[in-house]
Curated annotation (Swiss-Prot):
Residues 28-536 are lumenal. This is Alpha-1,3-mannosyl-glycoprotein 4-beta-N-acetylglucosaminyltransferase A. It comes from Xenopus tropicalis (Western clawed frog). Inhibited by UDP. Residues 1-6 are cytoplasmic. The lineage of its organism: Eukaryota, Metazoa, Chordata, Craniata, Vertebrata. Belongs to the glycosyltransferase 54 family.
Length: 536
């Protein structure tokens, strides 16, 4: 009897274990499918945005053609013979077009009038490749003749060798040879065709160069910011090179990332870039940065390239590209009546930095003759000790004593982890939003791999509703309301505070972490995520 009972118990344990494993496997598969559907939905959303932008582009191009037609008609009006061979219907249409007094919208020819002197000034003089379109990520690599050493082949090998077969079908790498000497350009093309024959024939790699007529006269530029004549010429041409490359790349994919011809890439860089962009698909970002150096690793959404190129062309003679990019952000979101800190907070929502860096600069000799640049990205090999999220613009403050520059501001912006000396009862961390925010969820994670014990204990999460009168009418919130108007909605457990924010508390003016008891350890916050409601 005892043996029989043991057999039954064993069978029950086996069946229970089997059912549990089956349930867990089904749940895990369902979760993975849901995540895959979410990624596909975000990708579809981006493609629809691209399609809408291209429709507007076609409309703009049709208006440009119409303007050109008007100019031709105006020139022909002086000659009756020039119009005699048209039908009566066409002549009526010509008359209607001539009589319309439409305003003239500035375009690229306004800033670069020399382009009107030659047909094909905006068409590549050399174009090698299949012209692949419809990809997720377009990578642009400008290159020019270097007097000492070219790093182009090493750069391409680093990018291509770290792509999986599937990833090679979802991107295109454009090499822009910024030279008008066709003999030199063709030598570069021949060299790349020999080294990367498979990649070019498959459509992964393209090579283009601009016509000589694309460039204006660069010999009489005004010297500014203490730069020499040669440096002003170099940076001005560089701005024009970037614009040509971006205009060519815009229609090919969802995202465009700017690289250089003297870099190396990290393993899995492509999937990291794509997944990070998809995670932020609901955010109103303009630049994602995957390197802290210059223009390396700066990624844009295809529709935004129009604005960026237009802005650069307005001031291409005045300042370097990285300065102009910062000015675009300032114009979009900074209030002249607010201080620099407020401006930086606003810009941080448009310019989001990913760490650790995915690209490292390796070139010693600059494309500017005689310039040695020992530039390295210090974040390239750093382990990631914090997680990056886009949080609502807010003024952050704390009563805790910060350790070695690991400030709360940097953590909130996703630039670093927050590290502070031993908390005591009454200490707080406060996030005061620039404007009331509808918050869907919150997440605060303390400790990190190097200091796992530096966690928050006996700490609560509290929110301050913007509409206090409505909240006070609810009987179920009385016990959660504090004397200063905040409502306690959660607490840290095992170093983590995570949960939803009830809709009746929204919108929220501020969020606070309050320490209830003295702690025996220091504290690290390595992740802060205040997730806005998508409908906000």
């Amino acid at each position: 009897m005892r043996l029989r009972n043991g057999t039954v118990a064993t069978a029950l344990v086996f069946i229970t274990t089997f059912l549990s494993l089956s349930w867990y496997t089904a749940w895990q598969n369902g979760k993975e499918k849901l995540m895959a559907y979410q990624r596909e939905f975000h990708a579809l959303k981006e493609r629809l945005r691209i399609a809408e932008h291209r429709t507007l582009q076609r409309s703009s191009e049709l208006h440009a053609i119409l303007d050109h037609f008007r100019r031709m008609i105006k020139e022909a009006n002086g000659s009756r013979d020039a119009l005699n061979h048209f039908s009566d219907e066409t002549q009526k249409l010509i008359k209607d077009l001539t009589n319309r007094k439409a305003l003239q919208v500035p375009n690229i020819y306004y800033h670069m009038p020399h382009l009107l002197n030659h047909d094909g000034s905006l068409q590549p003089a050399v174009q090698v490749g299949l012209g692949r379109t419809g990809v997720s990520v377009v990578m642009g690599i400008p290159t020019v003749k270097r007097r000492v050493k070219s790093y182009l082949k090493e750069t391409l090998h680093s990018l291509i060798d770290k792509l999986s077969p599937e990833e090679k079908l979802d991107c295109v790498i454009i090499v822009f040879v910024g030279e008008t000497d066709l003999e030199y350009v063709n030598s570069v093309v021949a060299s790349l065709q020999k080294e990367f024959a498979t990649e070019i024939s498959s459509g992964l790699v393209e090579v283009i160069s601009p016509p000589a007529t694309y460039y204006p006269d660069l010999n009489n530029l005004k010297e500014t910011f203490g730069d020499s004549k040669e440096r002003v010429r170099w940076r001005t041409k560089q701005n024009l090179d970037y614009c040509f490359l971006m205009m060519y790349a815009q229609r090919k994919g969802i995202y465009y990332i700017q690289l250089e011809d003297d870099i190396v890439a990290k393993q899995n860089y492509f999937s990291t870039i794509k997944n990070f962009a998809l995670q932020l698909s609901s955010e109103d970002w303009m630049i994602l940065e995957f390197s802290q150096l210059g223009f390396i690793g700066k990624m844009f959404q295809a529709p935004d390239i129009t604005l960026i190129v237009e802005f650069i062309l307005m001031f291409y003679k005045e300042k370097p590209i990285d300065w102009l990019l910062d000015h675009i952000l300032w114009v979009k979101v900074c209030n002249p009546e607010k201080d620099a800190k407020h401006c930086d907070r606003q810009k941080s929502n448009l310019r989001i930095r990913f760490r650790p860096s995915l690209f490292q600069h390796v070139g010693l000799h600059s494309s500017l003759a005689g310039k040695i640049q020992k530039l390295t990205d210090k974040d390239f090999l750093k382990p990631l000790l914090h997680k990056i999220h886009v949080n609502p613009p807010a003024e952050v403050s704390t009563s805790l004593k910060v350790y070695q520059g690991h400030t709360l501001e940097k953590t909130y912006l996703g630039e670093d982890f927050f590290w502070a000396i031993t908390p005591v009862a009454g200490d707080y961390i406060l996030f005061k939003f620039d404007k009331p925010v509808n918050v869907e969820r919150y997440l605060f994670r303390s400790g990190n791999p190097e200091h796992p014990g530096d966690q928050l204990w006996n700490t609560t999460v509290e929110v301050l509703p913007y509409r206090k009168d409505i909240v006070e009418l609810r009987s179920d919130t009385k016990d959660k309301r504090l004397s200063d108007g905040f409502f306690r909605i959660g607490k840290f457990e095992d170093g983590l505070a995570e949960g939803p924010v009830n809709s009746y508390l929204n919108p929220i003016s501020a969020l606070r972490l309050s320490v209830l008891q003295n702690s025996a350890v220091w504290v690290i916050l390595n992740e802060i995520h205040i997730k806005r409601n998508p409908a906000d």
